[in-house]
Every structure is written in structure tokens, then in C-alpha cells.
Amino acid sequence: TEIGIQIEQPDRPGGVLFDNMTALDNLCTSLIPKAGQHIIRKKIVSSILSEALRWFPKEMLLQPLSSWSYPERLRFSYYRWYLLNPRLLICFFPFAGQESTHHKMIIDLLVLCAQRGMAVWIISSGIDAICEKTDNEEFLRRLHYLNK
């Protein structure tokens, strides 16, 4: 995957998540085509599940995303990009409409993506206010502004 696009609210209709599918099925739908045809599907699903268990309880992964809370779904959408590992992740207004308690989670996940080697672009207004609230030094160090 060359480019990933994280929209403002990934769980809205037409977003990047499939509500009626389980979280595990959402991940498999995204990752199995990337794995290629040489790997057995059952082995891929097992690998995806074992990696996802580091982030989410198994019970949650086997439930439809429609049963998850909004913060959980938001975290899952960023986690999906973490696994897909595109070269560039473009995030459109990731903090807009979010409770301030979600800002830290989003920032931490974006830093994890950057540590994995992704270039992360944040297209947003009000980023100064976000920077004032965060204590994530790596996020602040990696942040570069383009103002026009």
C-alpha cells in the first residue's frame, strides 16, 4: 500500500470500516490481498489475530464493529493503518469533532505509525492548540508545519 487516507470520522457511512463485519474480518479484508497468494489463508488469519490480540481483547475482535464504542472504533481505524503500513498516511482533520481525551490516543497511534517508517501528513486547522495540550515529545519533535 503506497498511500493510506484516514478520514475525519472513519465510522460514518461510506467510511473505511465495515460496521456489520467483525473487527477481525475488517483486518483480514484489508490485509489478505497484501499478503499474496503464496500464504495459506488460515495462517494469515491466525497471524492477524495474534498481532491484534496485543491491542484488543479477543472477544472484541470477534464482534461486529457496530457494537464497539466510538473511541474503540477510532482506535481500531488507526490500528488498521498501522498494520497496513502504507508509505504515506494522510489524516484529514484527525482531531476535529473529537473529545480531548481522544487526542492523546490519536497522537500516540500516529507516532507509532511514524516509528514504523510511515510518513504521516496531518491536514488540520487548530494544530497549535493540540500541540499545547500534548506531552508526547516525539510527536512535537517530528511535527513540521507547512503554512500558506
Regions found by a protein language model. Name each.
Residues 103-116:
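Helical segment within the ABC ATPase nucleotide-binding domain
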